[in-house]
UniProtKB/Swiss-Prot annotation:
Subunit relationships: Homodimer.
Record's protein name: Uroporphyrinogen decarboxylase
InterPro entries tied to this protein: UROD/MetE-like_sf (IPR038071), Uroporphyrinogen_deCO2ase_HemE (IPR006361), Uroporphyrinogen_deCOase (IPR000257)
Species per Swiss-Prot/TrEMBL record: Prochlorococcus marinus (strain MIT 9301)
Residues holding substrate: 26-30, 76, 153, 208, 323
Highest rank taxon of the organism: Bacteria
Record-annotated site: Transition state stabilizer: 76
SUPFAM superfamilies per record: UROD/MetE-like
Leading EC class: lyase
Keywords for the protein's UniProt record, in alphabetical order: Cytoplasm, Decarboxylase, Lyase, Porphyrin biosynthesis
Chief localization: cytoplasm
Pathway: Porphyrin-containing compound metabolism; protoporphyrin-IX biosynthesis; coproporphyrinogen-III from 5-aminolevulinate: step 4/4
Length: 346
């Protein structure tokens, strides 16, 4: 990979660094006025995320504003679905709507194999431009949704509070669900490889809804498919660091560590000292800062960052929030998060 690597990539690879890198999940988005202004001109989320010029511009907005150590592709975890024959729309304030939810064997068997270079070439274009223009001043990140979370969306047909439809499938027709999960694992593995080939230097897997599973069901329906995605990627790109994020993961941290990922991204509901004891030392840790703290004053933000970092100084760590930054967060508080984060030293 050569030396003079950007800080986040160096840290993710386990190299000695002077300070923890800092970026934020959803750092490009609604809390930024420049994004809201662009959204007025381009109200369709799918257009913003699938038009390469717009996706590139939005991805770069926080880089120009705050100079984070990571620049993440502006996209969505559902973006690869149409390439498998599953159409969706994202409705403002309602979230994603799947036009034809997947609930039968016939539907699963008729899903297309994902060919990222054909159906997702716009993603490749954006990542290639980001890699060139960021020019190692920051690390370019790609991301995907994990099989369980994608399945939850396509079976439920929309966001859900209790996941009754996919859980009904899990406990009544487990073979059908496993077939769907396996299809997603292969496709998502290929999609991640395409992102890396196009310019992503670190990638993150979001299994946002795996925290809705009991630990024993995580071992059946989520963990094995996360592992399969990781194995597909590592077979071709063994050096590329992979981060795994699950919302509500306090009950499954040890299980996450067994998937083969390099870094575990924590939400804010687990004490970071406890997490350090439960996650093997060879695995890095990211996040854990409550995004709600960014509604506080500057001193409370700085204090929380210091408090978090002091508990994890002897571990590989990437400063981040425990969830995406929330809409309505004051931009100057995001600025404080980045500025103070960059003052930390090992």
């Amino acid at each position: 990979m050569g030396e003079n690597l950007p800080l986040l990539l160096s840290a993710a690879l386990g190299k000695k660094v002077n300070r923890p890198p800092v970026w934020m999940m959803r750092q490009a988005g609604r809390y930024m006025k420049i994004y809201r202004d662009l959204r007025e001109r381009y109200p369709s989320f799918r257009e913003r995320s699938e038009n390469p010029e717009l996706s590139y511009e939005i991805s770069m907005q926080p880089f120009h504003a705050f100079k984070p150590d990571g620049v993440i592709l502006f996209s969505d975890i559902l973006t690869p679905l149409p390439g498998m024959g599953i159409n969706f729309e994202i409705i403002e304030s309602k979230g994603p709507i799947i036009e034809d939810p997947i609930r039968t064997l016939n539907q699963v068997e008729n899903l297309k194999e994902l060919s990222p270079s054909e159906s997702l070439s716009f993603v490749g274009e954006v990542l290639t431009s980001l890699k060139k223009d960021v020019n190692n001043e920051a690390t370019v990140l790609g991301f995907v949704g994990a099989p369980w979370t994608l399945a939850a969306y396509v079976v439920e047909g929309k966001s859900s509070k209790n996941y009754s439809l996919i859980k009904s499938m899990a406990f009544n027709k487990p073979d059908l669900l496993h077939k769907l999960l396996d299809h997603f694992a292969k496709s998502i593995g290929e999609y991640l490889k395409y992102q890396i080939k196009s310019g992503a230097q670190v990638v993150q897997i979001f299994d946002s809804w795996a925290g809705q599973l009991s630990p024993q069901d995580y071992d059946i329906f989520a963990g094995p498919y996360q592992k399969k995605v990781v194995e597909i990627v590592k077979a071709e790109y063994p050096e590329t660091p992979i981060i795994l994020y699950i919302s509500g993961s306090a009950g499954v941290l040890e299980r996450m560590a067994k998937t083969g990922v390099d870094i575990i991204s924590l939400d804010w509901t687990v004490d970071i000292e406890e997490a350090c004891k439960r996650i093997p030392r060879g695995i890095g840790i990211q996040g854990n800062v409550d995004p709600g703290i960014l509604f506080g004053n500057k001193e409370s933000i700085k204090e929380r960052i210091d408090n978090t970092f002091n508990k994890i100084k002897d571990r590989k760590y990437i400063l981040n929030l425990g969830h995406g930054i929330l809409p309505g967060t004051p931009e100057e508080n995001a600025q404080t998060f980045f500025e103070h984060g960059k003052k930390l030293t090992y």
